[in-house]
Amino acid sequence: MERNQRRTLVGRVVSDKMDKTITVIVETKRNHPVYGKRINYSKKYKAHDEKNIAKEGDIVRIMETRPLSATKHFRLVEVLEEAVII
C-alpha cells in the first residue's frame, strides 16, 4: 500500500503518559439504521509519537501503519491544533 492510500483519522489526544505513544479518541456520527437519529460513536486508538510532541487535549492526524506493537497500528502525522492550557 502506498502512503497516500493508508487510512488517516483526526482525533483528540486523551493520554500522553506512555513513552513515544499517545492514545487518540476519534469521534464519528452515524444515523441509526431504523430510527434515523444521529448517534455519536467514539473509538480509541494508540499511535506512535516518535518525538513526544503531542500533548493531552491536542487535535492530531494519525495514519495507519504496520503493527508497531500488540495494540499500536497508527503513527502520528501532524498536530493540527494545540490544546489551550488554562
UniProtKB/Swiss-Prot annotation:
Pfam families: Ribosomal_S17. CDD domains: Ribosomal_uS17. InterPro entries: NA-bd_OB-fold, Ribosomal_uS17, Ribosomal_uS17_bact/chlr, Ribosomal_uS17_CS. Disulfide bonds: none annotated. Keywords: Ribonucleoprotein, Ribosomal protein, RNA-binding, rRNA-binding. GO terms for cellular component: cytosolic small ribosomal subunit. It comes from the Bacteria. One of its GO terms (biological process) is translation. One of its GO terms (molecular function) is rRNA binding. One of the primary rRNA binding proteins, it binds specifically to the 5'-end of 16S ribosomal RNA. Part of the 30S ribosomal subunit. Belongs to the universal ribosomal protein uS17 family. This is Small ribosomal subunit protein uS17. The gene is rpsQ.
